[in-house]
Amino acid sequence: MDSEDIPDFSSLKEETAYWKELSLKYKQSFQEARDELVEFQEGSRELEAELEAQLVQAEQRNRDLQADNQRLKYEVEALKEKLEHQYAQSYKQVSVLEDDLSQTRAIKEQLHKYVRELEQANDDLERAKRATIVSLEDFEQRLNQAIERNAFLESELDEKESLLVSVQRLKDEARDLRQELAVRERQQEVTRKSAPSSPTLDCEKMDSAVQASLSLPATPVGKGTENTFPSPKAIPNGFGTSPLTPSARISALNIVGDLLRKVGALESKLAACRNFAKDQASRKSYISGNVNCGVLNGNGTKFSRSGHTSFFDKGAVNGFDPAPPPPGLGSSRPSSAPGMLPLSV
């Protein structure tokens, strides 16, 4: 306190009271300051303890954060290495995939070319198939015709068998007629000596006409006829059936000639049928080879039609050599084709 602030006292009591009052005032302020100091110290201690606790927590947190930071650094390093490794692998995979893509594109181009070639080949094969189908239909049609013709010829063959039976029966009848003719000639020789001359001449003329008609075969007769039909001179005396009239004998011989001519025609048809069957078998094998070649080359095979309508005559029918038929027994047989083998009955 400055000396200028001290007032002037009139008495000692006033000065003493002033200083007492001033000391009390300072004492009170000191007490308040000390209380405030104590409060401040207590508050500072509490604050210091709290700050120390916060510091400990902060240090612990800092250590944890540092540990986390270090761990994260390690993880970052590991991730960097892993990323670099993955990047290298992905780069290798991308390069491999690019190579595969280029190869795949090349293969795709080749496959496109191959598909186009296959389509062209398929078109060629379809055309060849259509041509082959047409050829096979034609062949089947001709084969069906041949089958029908074979069936017809088989029916004719059956008819020929029945005719052969009839021919054999007629041959037997002709042999009997020849035997009867021989007996009749002998009887006429006997009666010629005893009868007058004019009736004998008439009988001789009639018998010579009948013998001439019997000596001429109804079919072409060859060397085998001499063995099959014995001549009247070679037949010994025997007992025949009842004698027939000359007209009946001539009609019977005409029937035999017609039957033999029919048998010859049937045998020629049978030979033609056999040759046709052989020709069809060889043609079928030839056609199968040509069809396979046509499928490979894309061209259908065209088959030429050849009609097997010609009849083949035999060199000898039932052992007879070909000879012109006698007049009055019908038209002659069709001409025979060369190289045909005879069929024996």
Curated annotation (Swiss-Prot):
A lipid is attached at C273 (S-palmitoyl cysteine). It is found in: Cytoplasm, Cytoskeleton; Cytoplasm, Cytoskeleton, Microtubule organizing center, Centrosome; Chromosome, Centromere, Kinetochore; Cytoplasm, Cytoskeleton, Spindle. GO terms for molecular function: microtubule binding. The keyword Membrane does not apply. Residues 189-256 are annotated as: Interaction with YWHAE. Signal peptide: none annotated. The keyword Membrane does not apply. The modification Phosphothreonine is found at T219, T245. Residues 175-345 are annotated as: Interaction with CENPF. Residues 195-256 are annotated as: Interaction with KATNA1. InterPro entries: NUDE (IPR033494), NUDE_dom (IPR006964). Residues 241-280 are annotated as: Interaction with DISC1. Residues 56-166 are annotated as: Self-association. Residues 28-190 form a coiled coil. Belongs to the nudE family. This is Nuclear distribution protein nudE-like 1. It comes from Pongo abelii. The gene is NDEL1.
